[in-house]
């Protein structure tokens, strides 16, 4: 199964050859961080930048994770997937490589966002906070990457997947605790937020910063990651055996 490393290297090289793409993927989360943290007036008891930064980190990983489906769809449409399947390597290594790649990319982007947040006034936290944040974001990335990959294997072309990505990403983000505390939500919205994986990623990171226990949110993310890996693996085997 170590063969997945070659697929990770391939995607990292392809990403590195497109510096404009690397820059563009950072602009939106950085703009959201500056706008929500410094410009938009919000009634919040405390440093709102400390509250909103985890939400921006989660949005960054959400965007990167869903790109696993885009990459899978491109490989499928351009015929690379069939060529990879002909290689003497476990077919699951293709899927694992995609998930690991988008997780690495999301963590690199999140690191830049954390640095920007510190520059504009977010509180400095302990080393364990940043290590724990990376672990939480990695788990969350696996969940989202599996959702994206499963969707791309179920859809027929890139345009359809792009529509799915647009339809899913913003509702997931806004119907979570990324920008608004759970206690400030209307009752109907709380029910949606409780079913949203972004809420658990946000809550776990914020718990690290406030000294509360993140274990419940981490457990939920761990279960979701395991379930989505099983579903995505099943879908990938079924799609590539036909």
Predicted regions, residues:
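Membrane-interfacial helix-loop-helix junctions in multi-pass membrane proteins
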Residues: 14, 43-44, 123, 173-227, ...
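Hydrophobic alpha-helical transmembrane segments of multi-pass membrane transport proteins
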Residues: 31-35, 49-120, 140, 148, ...
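Alpha-helical transmembrane segments and their short interhelical loops
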Residues: 91-165, 212-233
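Short, hydrophobic transmembrane alpha-helix segments
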Residues: 38-46
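Short amphipathic alpha-helical coupling elements at transmembrane boundaries
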Residues: 6, 10-14, 79-86, 153-156, ...
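Aromatic- and glycine-rich beta-strand/loop motifs that create alpha-glucan
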Residues: 1-28
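Short cytosolic juxtamembrane segments of multi-pass membrane proteins
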Residues: 236-242
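Pore- or pathway-lining transmembrane helices of multi-pass membrane proteins that form conduits
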Residues: 23-29, 156-177
């Amino acid at each position: 199964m170590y063969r997945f490393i070659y697929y990770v290297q391939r995607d990292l090289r392809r990403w590195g050859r497109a510096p404009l793409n690397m820059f563009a993927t950072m602009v939106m989360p950085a703009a959201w961080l500056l706008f929500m943290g410094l410009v938009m007036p919000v009634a919040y008891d405390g440093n709102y930048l400390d509250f909103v930064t985890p939400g921006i980190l989660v949005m960054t990983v959400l965007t990167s994770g869903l790109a696993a489906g885009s990459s899978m769809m491109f490989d499928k449409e351009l015929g690379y997937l069939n060529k990879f399947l002909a290689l003497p390597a476990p077919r699951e290594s293709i899927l694992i490589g995609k998930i690991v790649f988008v997780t690495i990319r999301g963590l690199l982007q999140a690191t830049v966002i954390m640095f920007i947040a510190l520059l504009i006034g977010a509180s400095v936290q302990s080393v364990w906070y940043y290590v724990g944040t990376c672990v939480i974001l990695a788990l969350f990335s696996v969940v989202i990457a599996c959702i994206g990959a499963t969707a791309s294997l179920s859809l027929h072309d890139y345009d359809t997947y792009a529509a799915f990505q647009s339809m899913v990403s913003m509702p997931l983000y806004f119907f979570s605790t990324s920008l608004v505390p759970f206690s400030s939500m209307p009752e109907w919205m709380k029910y949606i937020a409780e079913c949203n994986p972004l809420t658990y990623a946000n809550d776990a990171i914020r718990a690290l910063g406030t000294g509360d226990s993140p274990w419940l949110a981490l457990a939920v993310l761990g279960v979701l990651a395991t379930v989505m890996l099983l579903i995505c693996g099943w879908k990938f085997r079924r799609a590539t055996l036909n």
